[in-house]
């Protein structure tokens, strides 16, 4: 299983696209969200927020929810 660290940044859409491609390719993934990377300090939540292992339909729902979120 791959563990993907998704960093909140200006390139969020690229990170989520990587997740989508890996899931569509049949990879099992564990998504870990981390804080903003644009800081000189360690990102907020630098340990990441481990998400449970997601089925494809659950990941699609998570992605749709994240895309609606204006700020985290």
What residues fall within each predicted segment?
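Short, glycine-rich nucleotide/cofactor-binding loops
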Residues: 2-16
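Short, charged, surface-exposed secondary-structure boundary motifs
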Residues: 15, 40-42, 57-60
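A short, Lys/Arg-enriched amphipathic alpha-helix followed by its capping loop at the start of a domain
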Residues: 18-27
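Short internal beta-strands
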Residues: 27-37
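N-terminal beta-loop-helix "entrance" segment that forms/cooperates
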Residues: 36-51
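Glycine-rich, highly charged phosphate/nucleotide-binding loops
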Residues: 47-63
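An anion/phosphate-binding loop that grips the pyrophosphate of nucleotide cofactors and donors
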Residues: 66
């Amino acid at each position: 299983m791959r563990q993907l660290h998704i960093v909140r940044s200006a390139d969020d859409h690229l990170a989520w696209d990587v997740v989508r491609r890996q899931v569509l390719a049949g990879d099992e993934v564990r998504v870990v969200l981390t804080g903003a990377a644009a800081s000189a300090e360690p990102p907020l939540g630098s340990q990441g927020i481990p998400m449970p292992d997601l089925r494809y339909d659950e990941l699609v729902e998570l992605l749709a929810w994240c895309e609606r979120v204006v700020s985290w």
